[in-house]
UniProtKB/Swiss-Prot annotation:
Protein name per Swiss-Prot or TrEMBL: Small ribosomal subunit biogenesis GTPase RsgA
Gene of this entry: rsgA
Organism domain of life: Bacteria
PROSITE patterns: ENGC_GTPASE, G_CP
GO biological process, one term: ribosomal small subunit biogenesis
Annotated Polar residues bias: 10-21
PANTHER family from the UniProt entry: SMALL RIBOSOMAL SUBUNIT BIOGENESIS GTPASE RSGA, SMALL RIBOSOMAL SUBUNIT BIOGENESIS GTPASE RSGA 1, MITOCHONDRIAL-RELATED
Co-factor note (free text): Binds 1 zinc ion per subunit.
Native species: Neisseria gonorrhoeae (strain ATCC 700825 / FA 1090)
One GO CC term on file: cytoplasm
Length: 307
């Protein structure tokens, strides 16, 4: 009769490999090298077969043992979500199985509306709840940026203000019960927020970097932490661009909360929402029911994907 344990070799002699769980979660990734954690909390260094790179931080995976400290990742388990970006040349997986994206922004240095809108689109496409975090809210330059962010509140995206001296306490209720990821431009204070939320856990990241011989600070790679038994947090590297080439142009209106209710209401089924008569999108922008700038953004992304 076959053994019930997936790693058993049928020999009765105790073997440390047999105690290893056959599933794990990726908590950090450096190229084709990973750190995984099994349900009992044990961590292992992990590699992949055939130089696969289609794994992301947060992935739940099947593993096979190599020795007491190392495993091989065989495949990932079905994903609840996948957040990634893609330009004309390459695809970058950001995180898997997250339920909430926190886009960290601040008035200083210059915030990017382009990056914010693109990240929101990616979250909508992935079925991930999005929250905008206005960091450094005590800066005098904040008022003008906050006024711009209030528009996104009208679209259903909460805007949470944080200040360094508050130790990120205003974020904790928002994070609770979610698998969260912090994402934002470089210089927005994202790492400071993460450190405030994680406390002593950040001291362990140096050991992980050394174990993988990365020679780099771990903020150059996504890293997953447990805030409590119900809440996870992924700290991701800062970025300046968010390619959306993985999206389909025809699906874009569904990812705009301010336009999705108009899908199917144009006179022509193949309306490009530009010069056609009877365009519901144009009518909404002209009457003030929708933002002309948002319509221009939709048109621009459509051109980008079709070009």
């Amino acid at each position: 009769m076959p053994s019930e344990h997936p790693f058993s070799d049928g020999i009765s002699t105790p073997n440390p490999k047999e105690t290893m769980n056959d599933t794990a979660q990726i908590t950090a990734g450096y190229g084709r090298r990973y750190i995984v954690r099994t349900p009992d909390g044990t961590t292992y260094e992990a590699s992949t077969r055939k130089k696969r790179v289609d794994f992301a931080c947060g992935d739940r995976v099947r593993i096979s043992p190599v020795n007491a400290e190392q495993v091989v990742i065989e495949d990932f388990l079905p994903r609840q979500s996948l957040l990634y970006r893609q330009d004309a040349w390459k695809t970058k997986l950001i995180a898997a199985n997250v339920t909430q994206l926190l886009i960290v922004t601040a008035a200083v240095p210059s915030p990017s509306v382009r990056l914010l809108q693109r990240a929101l689109l990616a979250a909508e496409a992935a079925g991930i709840r999005a929250v905008i975090v206005l960091n450094k809210a005590d800066l005098p330059e904040t008022a003008l940026w906050l006024e711009k962010l209030k528009f996104y509140e009208t679209l259903g995206y909460p805007v949470i203000e944080t200040r360094v001296l508050e130790n990120a306490d205003s974020l904790r209720p928002v994070l609770q019960g979610h698998s969260n990821i912090l994402l934002g431009q470089s210089g927005m204070g994202k790492s400071t927020l993460a450190n405030a939320l994680l406390g002593s856990q950040t001291a362990r990241t140096g050991d992980i970097s050394a174990a993988l011989d990365s020679g780099k600070h771990t903020t150059t790679h996504a890293r997953l932490y447990d805030l409590n038994g119900e809440t996870q947090l992924i700290d991701s590297p800062g970025l300046q661009e968010f390619g959306l080439h993985h999206l389909q142009a025809a699906d874009l209106p569904h990812y705009f909360p301010d336009f999705r209710h108009l899908v199917g209401q144009c006179r022509f089924h193949n309306c490009t929402h530009r010069a056609e008569p009877g365009c519901a999108f144009k009518a909404a922008a002209e009457t003030g029911a929708a933002s002309p700038e948002r319509l221009a953004f939709l048109q621009g992304i459509t051109d980008e994907l079709l070009g």
